[in-house]
Amino acid sequence: MGKKKIHKRAIIVPDIHFPLQDDPAVEVVLKAIKMVKPNIFVCLGDLGEWKSVSPFKYKRRRRPPLEYVIEDLQKEVDAVEKGLDRFDKVLKSVKCPEMHMIEGNHDNWLNFFVEEYPYLKKFRFENAMHLAERGYKYHPYGKYLKIGKLYFYHGGHYTTTYHTKQHA
């Protein structure tokens, strides 16, 4: 007898950018999860927009006092968690056994912020989103996720117009 093939169903979702998400698109994905009942769910990075800690927000100006930044950041964390709750609810309802969170370049901005303020570890992406408690396998920015013969990677390293101009 031949080896029995195992078929897995997966849903891969890139670049949601909560709280700036496209709600109709999110609803379509949530319906797809209900229909497909995936064995695997992969968030392919940029779960949040993280405008409050964007390296571009204060490019030519000084950042305001930390207490103002933290207030904005906490609001953004709450909004992104609320968005992730929507996915978690549906994934739990279909009993999805394997969930992966790949850190995107926007998500990594939280880590850069914590590098500046090491006593704020609760704002590291993995911690702020409570990924372990939610049941996600966390994959840091720049690391590949391999499932079977497939590799998953966020990228985002060459997204500037400078790179395009240099390689056109």
Regions found by a protein language model. Give the residues of each.
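Short, flexible, glycine/charge-rich loop motifs used to bind or transfer phosphoryl groups or to couple energy/partner
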Residues: 1-2, 31-32, 161-167
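Short, flexible coil/linker segments at or flanking structured domains
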Residues: 4-6, 29, 133, 140
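Acidic, His/Gly-enriched loop-helix segments that form or flank divalent-metal centers
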Residues: 109-168
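Active-site neighborhood of phospho(di)ester-bond hydrolases with catalytic His/Asp-centered motifs
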Residues: 12-14, 40-46, 98-104, 139, ...
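Core catalytic region of metal-dependent phosphoesterases/phosphodiesterases
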Residues: 18-134
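Mobile, glycine- and charge-enriched loop segments
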Residues: 1-23, 148
